[in-house]
Amino acid sequence: MSLSGLITALATPFRADGALDPDGWQRLLHLQLEGGVHGVVVAGSTGEAATLTDAEYDLLLASAVERIGGRIPVMAGTGLSGTAKTIEQTRRAAALGASHALVVTPPYVRPTQAGLIAHYRAVADQGGLPVVLYNVPGRTGCDMQPETVAELASHPNIVGIKEAVGDTGRVQALLALRSPQFAVLSGDDGTAARSIRAGIDGLISVGSNVLPGAYRRMCELAAAHDHEATESWDARLQPFHDFCGVEPNPIPVKALLRRIGIGHDLRLPLLPLSASHHAAADHLAGDIAALEALSSH
């Protein structure tokens, strides 16, 4: 399955007591299908993967594959700090039916660029799934350089990158690597429209948890080079781009999900949205239904 358009980095709904909320998860999957997204990510950073037990990871991924697998890609977050553990987690995701592994640069350990190349080649060779690289230095402390990506893009089982560094120079460098065998995806909602217009393949989004149709519409218009309509949709979504960054992800988007009846709180060490942002969350939640309705016209 190709990787393009809008892919939602799914949040993981929990109940008020902190337990996994399977009913909320099913409602979130339904919302994404209704919104026409082109793929989903299960158990990434937005999904609070670091807080999940193995049993919870299995339940989330297996149920997502059962509900939407075969229709759109179901990517699984499998990146961990060690190579052997990442391979093991990738094999686990393959056995559960994931279409791709989204593999973040190893957090905390800060490998060299040569170390990244060796790490990703090992995962691609031994993990059993097509690998999508994921660069988000603000979270991991490790910035995978375009030259490193170029080295990895030639591997037949490394099929794309989610790049969360949204600056123009980085996007241009990665565009040179784009091919039918290697997709370039934005990991930054706020700069995605500009990047897609420049030629990248799509967006792995946080905001589309609550606005799948609206973010899909923005991505489709950007890919079609309808500049005026793209700018109009990007402007409508700008308050959501901004709000999702007022506190560490996924705190803000989970506050919005709670306001539309999906899930409750987060797991420690993340805390619920600060009271100073509640009014903004209430206001934005009130706009969601109208924006989703408009996106279908």
Swiss-Prot record:
Where does this protein come from, organism-wise? Stenotrophomonas maltophilia (strain K279a)
SMART domains attached here?
A: DHDPS (SM01130)
PROSITE patterns xrefs: DHDPS_1 (PS00665), DHDPS_2 (PS00666)
Q: Which family does it belong to?
A: Belongs to the DapA family.
Q: Which GO terms describe its biological process?
A: diaminopimelate biosynthetic process; lysine biosynthetic process via diaminopimelate
Its biological purpose is as follows:
Catalyzes the condensation of (S)-aspartate-beta-semialdehyde [(S)-ASA] and pyruvate to 4-hydroxy-tetrahydrodipicolinate (HTPA).
Name of the protein in its database record: 4-hydroxy-tetrahydrodipicolinate synthase
* Stored InterPro entries: Aldolase_TIM, DapA, DapA-like, Schiff_base-form_aldolases_AS, Schiff_base-form_aldolases_CS
What is catalysed by this protein?
L-aspartate 4-semialdehyde + pyruvate = (2S,4S)-4-hydroxy-2,3,4,5-tetrahydrodipicolinate + H2O + H(+)
Query: Which residue numbers mark the site Part of a proton relay during catalysis?
Result: S45, Y108
Record localization: Cytoplasm
Bilayer-spanning residue ranges: none
List the keywords (alphabetical).
Amino-acid biosynthesis, Cytoplasm, Diaminopimelate biosynthesis, Lyase, Lysine biosynthesis, Schiff base
Q: Per UniProt, what is one GO molecular function of this protein?
A: 4-hydroxy-tetrahydrodipicolinate synthase activity
The pathway this protein participates in, as annotated, is:
Amino-acid biosynthesis; L-lysine biosynthesis via DAP pathway; (S)-tetrahydrodipicolinate from L-aspartate: step 3/4
For this record, the Gene Ontology CC terms, alphabetical, are: cytosol
The enzyme's E.C. designation:
4.3.3.7
